[in-house]
Structures are given as C-alpha cells and as structure tokens.
Amino acid sequence: MLKLFSAFRKDKIWDFDGGIHPPEMKTQSNGTPLRQVPLAPRFVIPLKQHIGAEGELCVSVGDRVLRGQALTRGRGRMLPVHAPTSGTVIAIAPHSTAHPSALAELSVIIDADGEDRWIEREGWSDYRAHSREALIERIHQYGVAGLGGAGFPTGVKLQGGGDKITTLIINAAECEPYITADDRLMQDCAAQIVEGIRILAHILQPREVLIGIEDNKPQAISMLRAVLADAHDISLRVIPTKYPSGGAKQLTQILTGKQVPHGGRSSDIGVLMQNVGTAYAVKRAVVDGEPITERVVTLTGEAVSRPGNVWARLGTPVRHLLNDAGFCPSADQMVIMGGPLMGFTLPWLDVPVVKITNCLLAPSVTEMGAPQEEKSCIRCSACADACPADLLPQQLYWFSKGQQHDKATAHHIADCIECGACAWVCPSNIPLVQYFRQEKAEINAIRLEEKRAAEAKARFEARQARLEREKAARLARHKSAAVQPAAKDQDAIAAALARVKEKQAQATQPVVIQAGSLPDNSAVIAAREARKAQARAKQAAHPVADSAIPGDDPRKAAVEAAIARAKARKQEQQAGSEPAEPVDPRKAAVEAAIARAKARKQEQQAGSEPAEAVDPRKAAVEAAIARAKARKQEQQAGGEPAEAVDPRKAAVEAAIARAKARKQEQQTGSEPAEPVDPRKAAVEAAIARAKARKQEQQAGSEPAEPADPRKAAVAAAIARVQAKKAAQQQVVNED
C-alpha cells in the first residue's frame, strides 16, 4: 500500500488558481528544424543583457576580437559579454536596446570580418573531475544567464542555492502563444540538454530532478523520453496546457504542490528552476568551452513569409533577422519582442538581439485585430478570476492609477508576474499590465531614492561624528598644551629657587682670610691675559686707519677737567683736615677697570667714527656748571668709617668690570659730523663765561649746601644729553 502511494505521489501533479487558454499559434514555426542565419555586417552588443550591473570593459576602439572573446569582465553579479564573431571594434557608445522604451545603453559595436574565427576553446569533457566552485565560476565567466526571459546570472543563482536545494526543476513548458524556441531546441538537441541538466544536478546535488513540459509538444516529449529511457536520476512530467503554467511559481506548484510565499523565492522552499535553453548553454560552456554567443529565436507572424526558429548571434539587428525570414511589413506594421501577452513592441528595428530575446513576432493587422478603445472598469472580477498569482488586479489598477504606492505594495503588486491574463479577459480593454509595470517601476524608483537618501544621511551622520571627534581631540590637545607650559613654568621657578638658595648658602659661609695673605686670583688673571691676547689679535687683524682718527671733543674734555679739579680739591681738603681713610681694594679695582674700558671705547670710537662738531656754547655752560658743583663739593667734608674688604667679592667685581670693558671695546659705531658755525660758537662761549662768573659769585655769597655726588653725576649726564640734543636741533634749523 505504501509503495502504491509513493508511486502515485511520484507522478502526481497539482494545479494553480486562475489561468487562461488563448490560441496557441505554435504550428507556424515549430515544424521546421533550426537553421543558421548569415552573419550581419555589424553587431551591437549591449554590456548589460542580464539582471544586475554591467561589466567592466576590457577592449577599446580599434581592437580586433575573435568569436567568444570576452568584451567585459564579470565580477560578483556582473556578467561578462562576449564577441559573437570575429572583427574590429569600431565604437563603444550608447545604443538603443531591447527595452519597451528603447533606452540607450552602453554597447560595443563590431564590424564583422566574415571569417568567424573562434578563440582557443578548452572543454571539460570530464566535468565531474572539477569542483563545484570551479564549475560555477566557469559558467559565470562564460556569460550564461537565464534564457527563459528573466536573464538572471546562472552562476549567481547556483551559488545562492547552496546545499538547501532539494528539487531541481527544468522548465520546458513554454506556455506563451507563438513561441516555439524551446520546443524546437528539445526536438533537435535533446541529448545536449540532458547532459546540461546532469551538470546542474552535479553542482546542486538535489534529491530529485524534474522536467516539466506541456502536453502540446508531442515531438519534444518523445525525443526527451528517448534520451531518458535508461535514466533514473531525471523524471519527465507532462502537464496540461494552460497559460501561464510556464511561470516559475506556477510550475513549482504544479510539480511539487508547494507555493512560494509572498515576497519570497522558490529557493525558500528548496526548489531551484532553470530553463531548457539555459541547460543547453551550460553544456556548451562546460563541456565544449564555448561562451554564450548565440541563442534560438522564433521568427513568426503572418508578416513573415518563412517563419521558423534560427540560431541568432547576440548583437544581430532585428531588421537583419526579419529580412532573412522574408519580412513583408505593412503600413502600420508592429514588431513584438517576446510573445503577444508578455512581450513589448519595438519602437524601431535597429535594436539588437540579446540573451533574453526568445521570439520576434511580426503579426498582420487582421491577426492582432483592430486596436480597441480603453473603457472604464466595470468591476466584473474577471481579471481576479484569471490571475494565477491570486491577486486583485482591479484594486491594483485603481491604486496604480491613483499613485497610491503604499496600498499597491500592501496588495502585493510585486508578486505580479506580468503574464497578461488579466488584460486578456478584461471586457473594458484596459491594458492592466502596462499600469502594473509603470507602478512597479515607480515604486522601485522611490525605494532607490529612499536608499540613496538613507546612504546620504548615514554619510552625513558619519561625517558629523568624525568632525565631533576631531573637535574633541583638538580641544583635548589645546587643554593639554595649556597645562604643559604651566608645569614647565613651575619647573623653571623651582630650578631658579634652588639656584638662589644655593647662592645664599654659599654667601653665608664664612670667609677666612689669613693675615698678610692675598686672594688666589691666578685663574682669573690667566683668563684675563687670554682675553687680552685675543683682543690684541683681533686688533692686529683689523688695523684702524690713521685718517679716521678724529680730534678731541672740547666739551667732554672741559667737563672731565672740571670734575678732576673738583675731586683734587676735595682730596686736598680731606688730607689736611681729616685722618686718612682706608683704601677699598675692591672699589679701586672696579674704578680702574671702568676707566680702562672707557679709554678703550674712546679709542675704538676715535678709530671708527667721524669727528663730531663741537658746540662751544654748550661746552662752556657745562664747564661752568661742573666748576660750580666742584666748589660745592670742596666746601663739603665728612668722614665715614672704612668698610671691611672682602677679597673674594673684590676679585669677582674686578673680573666683571674687565668683561664689560672688553665688551665695550668690541662695540663700534659711526655718526655723521655736524658743521660748526664759528660766529655762533664765539657768541655762545661769551654767554657761557658770563653765566659761569655769575654762578661763581652766587656760590661765594650763599652758604654751602651738602653735595650729593650721585646727583652731581646725574646732572652732568643730563647736561651732556641736552648739549647733544641742542646741537642736533641747531643743525636742523640751519638746514
């Protein structure tokens, strides 16, 4: 009983809802064998002949190509295309292709040389010796795609199936009227088709392989049964003729009883389907090593005098094929690529044959009938009864016409297979399929725009996040940079304090000076002698020109003479009235060093600077002021106790004085000489002498005030500065 049930289950077929029975019109073309078409002089090969992106070009204009040579590289879902014949690439430009709107796509245009030479072909006769991955890659690189109409890359489809495929279905139904390409291919090439099916089964390793064919193809059924007479791995299932039983979901339900869920694929239920033409192309790619460069195309219709099925090279213009079949166009002739229900009308005949082209229908006016006017929907539900996908075409029509995309999506418009059964039975002659195609295209465009917007938003948010991270990092760097200098300053302050403490500690140490001993200044003396020798060497290397020696400055000489006389008188008075003060060796050494430095500086200035003009008036004034201050200092006398002498500090100060003196020796300058007016100088000298006498009289009559040597020195310096400024102003006025 169980065996009987299994046998019944093995040969059982199911049915699907809906469907129609239009006139088949297949006898026009299925009675003649396949034939070759003469080569066209020019071929147009679109880069995209499948679902997915176009491949990357690997040829350029002017290249010579052979038949089967790859024109593009296939990576991922990109499927390569190959040259249909040998010739020369004359252009790579957009060209109208097989599309309802005749959209222009990038194409390679080849001028045939008539030789039709193949590339070197390498077949895998023992395909079982190769791995599954190698077979899939070969199928993909040889450009095999679904030849039943979808054009999905076969290699990608096989790769996606993986190990979850339990049933492999070969679609041989070919249910649409007029089309007999698969029927004729099964009659003439049944053995090659079965070999291709076994290659697919070897790759997928399914539990069962089923061939579904309609009962209106008796010759093809007999040929397949003859080839499968001794085969137990492939089952042939003959199904009733009903349109659209050749749809993937419908044939799956007929052969397995399983329904593909809404929005899903047949692989979700463990089923993978391939067309008989695809199986034949797989055999030629794997066993013969031939890329897909041609396919079977049905040429039919009453406008064609010699209908039949031909081997058409990919890229052949439609006009060339129809002319070879005896095309006799009428005034308003239409040409349909595909069948009368799922095909589309070509805007012109220069479009090329591609991988999904299975039929070229050229009907007469009487054959297609007069065009009828579209009327309003009467909601008769005939379209819903005929729909094989269990949809509501009348609702989808209203949603599509009203641009209600969300409702159309909710009513599963994506599951529409565009079979045309609803439009066939519509009494109002509404082209429902055209509305559904347009609505699905608009929905796809909206989804694509939403995807692009989401990607743009993601990029913007990523950019904003990156900018925020960079800003935070920049602020952190600024904060660390602001903290680091403070730490460095603290370190510097601490180091300075340490040095001060060290100096204070050294200063507090007692200095022991033995009686009658002198400080050891040998190191300082040696350094001084070395510097003197270095200075003498520099002077010898740079001798001073004798012509640059200027005359003495009478103003400075008078001031210094007056100061010297005042100091001399003061010393005489102190020597006569006060006891002698002890001599401070440190101060004496400092003063001597300063005197030597001044002397050297004057020598260098005399050697490098031009003589300055002497202002006798100001010189006399300064001399008188100096003499008055000297007399005041003479009248002042006092005594201060002698300070203790620190020999170490005296030596340090003497060394510092000598260093300053040498530094002043190295500095040189030059000032331009100012002109002297003898007449004005004599007048100013007389005025100065009068002022000096007046100051002497005032000094003799007024009581003497205590003199401050520091203020006297400051006053003398101010007098010298004013004298220089007055001389400069005089020169400006004279100019």
UniProtKB/Swiss-Prot annotation:
Stated family: Belongs to the 4Fe4S bacterial-type ferredoxin family. RnfC subfamily.
Membrane topology recorded in Swiss-Prot or TrEMBL: Peripheral membrane protein
InterPro entries per the UniProt record, alphabetical: 4Fe4S_Fe-S-bd, 4Fe4S_Fe_S_CS, Ion_transpt_RnfC/RsxC, Nuo51_FMN-bd, Nuo51_FMN-bd_sf, RnfC_N, Soluble_ligand-bd
Compartments, as annotated in UniProt: Cell inner membrane
Cofactor(s) this protein cannot do without: [4Fe-4S] cluster
Domain 4Fe-4S ferredoxin-type: 368-397, 407-436
GO biological process, one term: electron transport chain
Purpose of the protein: Part of a membrane-bound complex that couples electron transfer with translocation of ions across the membrane. Required to maintain the reduced state of SoxR.
Self-association state and partner proteins as the record states: The complex is composed of six subunits: RsxA, RsxB, RsxC, RsxD, RsxE and RsxG.
Protein name: Ion-translocating oxidoreductase complex subunit C
GO molecular function per UniProt: 4 iron, 4 sulfur cluster binding; electron transfer activity; metal ion binding
Cofactor note: Binds 2 [4Fe-4S] clusters per subunit.
Top-level taxon of origin: Bacteria
Family annotation (Gene3D superfamilies): 3.30.70.20, NADH-ubiquinone oxidoreductase 51kDa subunit (3.40.50.11540)
